[in-house]
Amino acid sequence: MANILRKWIESDRRELRRINRLANRVDSYQDQMAKLTDDELKAKTPEFRQRIQDGEDLDHLLPEAFAVAREGAKRVLGLFPFHVQVMGGIVLHEGNIAEMKTGEGKTLTATMPVYLNALSGKGVHVITVNEYLSERDAEEMGQLYRWLGCSVGVNGAQKSPDEKRAAYACDIMYSTNSEIGFDYLRDNMAVYKEDQVQRGLNFAIVDEVDSILIDEARTPLIISGPGTGTSKLYQQADRFVKTLKNEDDYKIDLESKTVSLTDEGIKKAEKYFNLKNLYDPENTALTHHLDQSLRANYIMLLDKDYVVNDGEVLIVDSFTGRVMEGRRFSDGLHQAIEAKEGVEIQEENKTMANITYQNLFRMYSKLAGMTGTARTEMEEFREIYNMETITIPTNRPVARVDEPDLLYPTLESKFRAVVKRIQALHEKGQPVLVGTVAVETSEYLSHLLDQQKIPHVVLNAKNHAREAEIIKNAGQVGAVTIATNMAGRGTDIKLGPGVKELGGLAVIGTERHESRRIDNQLRGRSGRQGDPGLSQFYLSLEDELMKRFGGDRIKNFLQRLQTDDDDEDVVIKSRFLTHQVESAQKRVEGNNYDSRKNVLQYDDVMREQREIIYRERQQVITEIDSLKWVLMPMVKRTIQRAIDAHTLGDKKDWKLQEIVDFAVEVLVKPDQITVGMLEGKSKDEMVDLMMDFAEQVYEEKKHQLYDDSQMLEFEKVVILRVVDAHWTDHIDAMDQFRQSVGLRGYGQQNPLVEYQTTGYRMFEQMVADIEYETTRLFMKSEIRQNVTR
C-alpha cells in the first residue's frame, strides 16, 4: 500500500513539473504581450484563427494564446491570472480536472483554455450548476472574450429556439448542465432540421464538476408525455401502509435505505386487498405501488428528502440542499409521496426521451472540469470519464486551521455544545457559517439560537432565492449563517473589514455528510486565498451516518460511556471513533460509486440503442433529395421477414395464402395478387415479385405528388411518425423491464446480462415493427395534398 501511495505522489509531482514547465513558456510571452497596443493584441485572434486553418494545432498555439488571454484579462477585467491559474488552465485544455481550492479564481482560470479552444470555431461550452452563475460569468468574462473578438452566448430554460440556436452558434456559450441535456433530447425529437438548436458537442468545461458528474450522475434527464392514470391505487396502497407496525409488518435496512414487508406484513396485505397470493404475476401493479408507498412512508423524510410547498411535493437535492425545480422522483415514488402527504396526486408520465449526465457528457469530443474537491473521486473520474484529477497548488499557503472532530453521546448534547461555541464566537464578533445536512436540522438549530437571542440567517431549500445575498454577507463581523449543503457553491464568502484580525470565518459542521467531499466543500468556504479561518465538525453517536454504518462496536462503546459517566455533555475524543467515521464514509462512497457504475452499465444498453435511432432519424431529417434509399430497403426487409415466416419446412407446406394476405394488407390492392402468381416460385423470386409491386406503388405516389419536394416531405412524415411512436413505446417498455429485471437475480440469472440480452431482442423487434408499419403506411396510404406532420 505504501509503495502504491509513493508511486501516486511521485507521478503527481512529475505531472505538476511538466505543467509548470509549460506555464513557464506562457510566462515567457508576458513582456512581449504587454508591449502590444490594444489593437495589436486584438489582432492576435484573427492571426491565430488563420494559423489554425493553415494546420497549426491548439497545443502548439497554447503558450502564445494563453499569454494573449492573460494580458487581455489585465486590460479588460483588471485581473492578471497567477502562475498557478495558468497551470490550472493547461490542465483544463488537456481535458482533465483541475482541483483548485475555494477562492483560487477558477472562473478566471477557465478564460485561457476557453479562449484557446474558441479559436477553432467549433464551439466551447462552459457548464455551471445554475442559471444565475451562467448569467453572471457570461456577463463578467464575456467582456474579455468579446474584446478579443469572440462571440459569447447564454443558454437558458426560458430562451426561445431562435435564441438558443444563436447561443449555440457562438464561439463560447454558458449553460446549465440540464439545459444542454434537454436541448439534446429535444433536438432528437424535432421533425425539421430548422427546429434543432445544437451544432455538435465539441469541448465543455464543467464548473463544480464533482457536483454535476458525480452527485447528479444517477439522475436521468427525462422528457415525458401523458401516461395512464393510477392515482386511486396510490391512495389505497398509502392507506394500507399506514396501518402497518414496524418490525412486525415491515423491516428497514438502514444501510441500503430499503424497506420490505415481513411475512406478517404480506399476510396483512393479502387480507386487506382480498388476495390469495400477493406476489402472483397478476398483482405486479399492486406490489409496485405498495413498494413505493413503503419507501414514501418509512424511508423518505419530509424537509430532508423533499419539501411541500403550496400543495406540491418538491425534491431536495441531498448533496446541494437545493430544491430541484421541475424534477420528480421516478417509478411512481413521487405519486406515493403525494398520497402520503395528502396533496393532489399528479398522474405518472410516459417517458418519451431520456439520457443520464454520464452518457451526455461522454459525448463531448473533449471534456474538462474544475472544482475545489475532486480528489476523493479521482478513480471514478478516470474510469468513467477518462479524466485525470490534478491538484493545483494554492497561490498562497492555506492558513485555515482544521480542528479535530468532537463527538457527543446524543444529538441533544451535541447541539448544546454547538450553540455554546456559536455564542462564544459571536460575542467576539467572528463570523460563523454552520453547515447542516437537512432542512429540518437547520430549522431546529435556528430555534435553539433564537432561544439564546443570537441573531442569524438561515439558508436552505425553502429560501434559496436569497442564496447569493445571504452568502455575500456571511463574512461580515458578527454574522451567523446556518446553511444546508448548498452553502453557496460558486459564490465566494469575502471577509468584511476587521474579520481577519478576529481569526477569519469559522465553519462549524453539525454532522458528517456521507461523502467526505461534501465535508471538504464546507471546510473550503473558509480560508480563501490565504485568509485565516477555522473549521470543526461536531458529531453525535445518534447521527444518521453513525446509525447506518457505525455497527455494534460503536453501540457497545456508547453503552460503556453511558454507564461510566452519566454526564450527557461529555466530549468523546477517540481515534477509534474518528477512524470509524471515515471508514463509514468510505463505505458509503464505495456503495454510491458501485451504484453509479451499475446505472451506467444499464444505461449503456439504452445509449447504444439511442445512438442508432437518433443517427437514423438525423439522416431522415437532413435529407434534401429523396428518402427512397432509406425506405425501399425497409420494404424489402419487411417482405423477406413475412416470406421467411410462411415458408418453413418443405415447399408443399408453404403457406402461400398467408403471403397473399400479407401483400394485400401491406403492399397492394386485393385484385393485384393471387396464390397462383406465387406457385412454383422460390423465396427469392417471391421477394423480387413483391419488390416489383413496391416499386410500382412508389412511382405512382411520386407521380401523384408532382413535385420531388412534396414526395420527400411525404417520406419524412411516414418514417418519423412511425419511428417516434415506436421509440417512445420502446423506452417505456425498457424502463418497466429494468424495474422488474432485478427480481430475476433470484433465479441464478445475472440481472444485467438478462437486461442486455432481452433488451437487444426487444430492440430488434421494435426495428422490425418500425419497418413493417412504415411499409404499410407508405404503400397503403391515400395521397392528399398539403402533407403535414
UniProtKB/Swiss-Prot annotation:
Identify the keywords attached in UniProt to this record, alphabetized.
ATP-binding, Cell membrane, Cytoplasm, Membrane, Nucleotide-binding, Protein transport, Translocase, Translocation, Transport
Decide whether keyword Ion transport is in the record.
no
Enzyme Commission designation: 7.4.2.8
Catalysed conversion reaction: ATP + H2O + cellular proteinSide 1 = ADP + phosphate + cellular proteinSide 2
Listed binding positions for ATP are: 85, 103-107, 492
Pfam families according to UniProt = P-loop_SecA, SecA_DEAD, SecA_PP_bind, SecA_SW
Location relative to the cell? Cell membrane; Cytoplasm
Q: What is its main location?
A: membrane
Q: What does this protein do?
A: Part of the Sec protein translocase complex. Interacts with the SecYEG preprotein conducting channel. Has a central role in coupling the hydrolysis of ATP to the transfer of proteins into and across the cell membrane, serving as an ATP-driven molecular motor driving the stepwise translocation of polypeptide chains across the membrane.
Question: What is the protein's quaternary organization?
Answer: Monomer and homodimer. Part of the essential Sec protein translocation apparatus which comprises SecA, SecYEG and auxiliary proteins SecDF. Other proteins may also be involved.
Task: Extract the NCBIfam families matched here.
Answer: PRK09200.1, PRK12904.1, secA
What is the protein's name according to its record? Protein translocase subunit SecA
Species, as recorded:
Limosilactobacillus fermentum (strain NBRC 3956 / LMG 18251) (Lactobacillus fermentum)
